[in-house]
Amino acid sequence: MAIYGIGTDIAQVSRIAAVLERTGGRFAEKVLGPDELRVFHARRARSEARGIAFLATRFSAKEAFSKAIGLGMHWPMTWRALQTLNHPSGEPYVVASGELADWLAARGITARVTVSDERDYAVSFVVAETDAAPAPVSRTSS
């Protein structure tokens, strides 16, 4: 495997909370995929703060992923096309759907993600890998 790209993002939890409040909850529905949305509602029902922290980590993960694959938030990378879920062990992993999944498969791209939150910040880091041969390093003459 070769590294296709890396991406990182940091989100301010209080800003995510403010947007969520201002939109009456629609922000979560716009950003989260169906499985993420179920987890968000369950966590928020137990603790408002943990629900918002979850939303912030998922927002951050999507931003980091979009950077790692080099598209930013442009087709086929859409908010709901990528979900960050957790294995029973707690380890996060990404799941792509629709045209994004097709785009990634055509390029042999897989990704690893890590997320963390502490008080007012959520941070994510993504390493996108490909099974394609690595590109040669560009050299300049001296």
UniProtKB/Swiss-Prot annotation:
Where is this protein chiefly located?
cytoplasm
Record bears the keyword DNA-binding: no
Cofactor or coenzyme needed: Mg(2+)
> Per the UniProt entry, what is one GO biological process?
fatty acid biosynthetic process
Tell me where on the tree of life, at the top rank, the source sits: Bacteria
Where in the chain are disulfide-linked cysteines found? none
The record ties this protein, via InterPro entries, to: 4-PPantetheinyl_Trfase_dom (IPR008278), 4-PPantetheinyl_Trfase_dom_sf (IPR037143), ACPS (IPR002582), Ppantetheine-prot_Trfase_dom (IPR004568)
Give the catalytic activity.
Answer: apo-[ACP] + CoA = holo-[ACP] + adenosine 3',5'-bisphosphate + H(+)
Q: Which Pfam families does the entry mention?
A: ACPS
Instruction: List, alphabetically, the GO terms of the cellular component aspect.
Output: cytoplasm
> EC annotation?
2.7.8.7
Q: Where does Mg(2+) bind?
A: D9, E63
Recorded GO molecular functions are:
holo-[acyl-carrier-protein] synthase activity; magnesium ion binding
Task: Report if keyword Phosphoprotein is assigned.
Answer: no
Q: List the keywords (alphabetical).
A: Cytoplasm, Fatty acid biosynthesis, Fatty acid metabolism, Lipid biosynthesis, Lipid metabolism, Magnesium, Metal-binding, Transferase
Q: Where in the cell is it found?
A: Cytoplasm
In UniProt terms, what function does this protein have? Transfers the 4'-phosphopantetheine moiety from coenzyme A to a Ser of acyl-carrier-protein.
Q: Which HAMAP family match?
A: AcpS
Stated family: Belongs to the P-Pant transferase superfamily. AcpS family.
Entry protein name: Holo-[acyl-carrier-protein] synthase
Recorded source organism is: Burkholderia lata (strain ATCC 17760 / DSM 23089 / LMG 22485 / NCIMB 9086 / R18194 / 383)
* Lineage summary: Bacteria, Pseudomonadati, Pseudomonadota, Betaproteobacteria, Burkholderiales
